[in-house]
Amino acid sequence: MADKPLTADQAEELHKYVIDGARAFVAIAAFAHVLAYSLTPWLH
């Protein structure tokens, strides 16, 4: 465990990376779902 809590600046930087990662994950997942829907006949 960390001995000291994050500063506000450190927390904001970490939050930015977490949100950017979540956005990238959602974008890739949405793209994969569109591909799966368009390329697989059993989903239509």
UniProtKB/Swiss-Prot annotation:
InterPro entries membership: Antenna_a/b, Antenna_beta_CS, Antenna_beta_dom_sf, LHB-1/5, Light-harvesting_complex
Gene: puc1B
Record GO cellular component, one term: plasma membrane
Name of the protein in question: Light-harvesting protein B-800/820 beta-1 chain
Organism the protein comes from: Rhodoblastus acidophilus
Subunit field text: The core complex is formed by different alpha and beta chains, binding bacteriochlorophyll molecules, and arranged most probably in tetrameric structures disposed around the reaction center. The non-pigmented gamma chains may constitute additional components.
GO terms classed as biological process: photosynthesis, light reaction
Superkingdom of the source species: Bacteria
Keywords from the UniProt entry: Antenna complex, Bacteriochlorophyll, Cell inner membrane, Cell membrane, Chlorophyll, Chromophore, Light-harvesting polypeptide, Magnesium, Membrane, Metal-binding, Transmembrane, Transmembrane helix
Matches recorded under Gene3D superfamilies: 1.20.5.250
Periplasmic topological segments: 40-44
Signal peptide: none
Membrane topology: Single-pass type II membrane protein
Binding site for a bacteriochlorophyll: H15, H33
UniProt-annotated location(s): Cell inner membrane
One Pfam family recorded for the sequence: LHC
Transmembrane segments: 17-39
Function: Antenna complexes are light-harvesting systems, which transfer the excitation energy to the reaction centers.
GO MF annotation list: bacteriochlorophyll binding; electron transporter, transferring electrons within the cyclic electron transport pathway of photosynthesis activity; metal ion binding
Family: Belongs to the antenna complex beta subunit family.
Cytoplasmic side: 2-16
